[in-house]
């Protein structure tokens, strides 16, 4: 769900918010797989945020199975229990690199003991700020620096 994001959005008044999610797939995968599965509803998620005080006009939604990911320069990207946890970071690697700028931050959950070349490539572009270790994953926080 989007409870963490709601608390963040209420505290920090972002000018642009992009929600990306696959809304429906034939299968629902609950471990780590090469492809992500979807069972979200972006319209309901946006409505939840709007009903809790986030302005509708700042929120864009995108289902990458239905539409092309928009160009969207970001300051902060959050992927909790999704990219890196259920599927490889490779899925969004190029998008993240192309749409980040100096000082962009990325926070995501990396499943332990799983090889993920996208995660390794992100570490070449971003500097790790913090890692919080959990039982099955590490929560990774990184920042993009010049010339990295």
What kind of region is each of these model predictions?
Residues 89-105:
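A short glycine-rich, Lys/Arg-flanked "PGG" loop and its adjoining helix->strand segment in the class I
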Residues 23-26, 83-85, 111-116:
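Short "lid" loop at the C-terminus of a central beta-strand within the Rossmann-like core
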Residues 120-148:
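Core SAM-dependent methyltransferase catalytic element
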Residues 32-70:
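S-adenosyl-L-methionine
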Residues 74-89:
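A short SAM/SAH-binding and catalytic strip from SAM-dependent methyltransferases
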Residues 1-14, 30:
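Conserved SAM-binding loop of SAM-dependent methyltransferases across substrates and taxa
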Residues 10-17, 22, 33, 102:
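Conserved S-adenosyl-L-methionine
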Residues 18, 102-113:
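Conserved beta-strand signature within the Rossmann-like core of class I S-adenosyl-L-methionine
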């Amino acid at each position: 769900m989007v409870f963490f994001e709601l608390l963040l959005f209420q505290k920090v008044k972002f000018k642009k918010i992009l929600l990306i999610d696959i809304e429906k797939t034939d299968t629902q995968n609950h471990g780590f797989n090469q492809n992500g599965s979807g069972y979200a509803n972006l319209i309901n998620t946006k409505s939840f945020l709007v009903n809790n005080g986030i302005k509708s006009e700042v929120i864009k939604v995108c289902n990458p199975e239905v539409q092309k990911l928009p160009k969207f320069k970001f300051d902060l990207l959050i992927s909790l229990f999704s990219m890196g946890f259920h599927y490889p970071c490779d899925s969004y690697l190029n998008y993240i690199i192309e749409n980040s700028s100096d000082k962009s931050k990325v926070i995501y959950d990396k499943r332990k003991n799983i090889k993920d070349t996208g995660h390794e490539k992100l570490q070449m572009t971003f500097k790790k700020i913090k890692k919080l270790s959990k039982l099955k994953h590490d929560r990774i926080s990184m920042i993009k620096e010049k010339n990295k």
